[in-house]
């Protein structure tokens, strides 16, 4: 199995820009024969104190990643943020199969808090 790691520069609160960057990484990884590509934590939403703002992109991100996985026939792992009730954010990591199906969606249960963000 050949695995690609995409250590990208994440643009905070700019999911569309991050998706465009990811698309080129995915295409390159597939062209070089990778079976899977993995992106960093919060790779498309970035860390944001405005989780409701980036949460609007959850479905477009998933649709784009599923399409790219199937189109390029490559498994993809990526991180994103959602907004749960009460306005608190959740840190997800999703893994898609080569056909674009969701294999796993992990929600971090012990998030790191450097600046006391959990109190917000």
Describe the predicted segments one by one.
Residues 1-5:
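Extreme N-terminal starter segment of soluble prokaryotic enzymes
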Residues 58-84:
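A short, hydrophobic beta-strand-centered structural micro-motif
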Residues 42-59, 85-89:
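Metal-dependent catalytic neighborhoods of phosphoester/phosphodiester hydrolases
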Residues 7-12:
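Short polar catalytic/cofactor-binding loops
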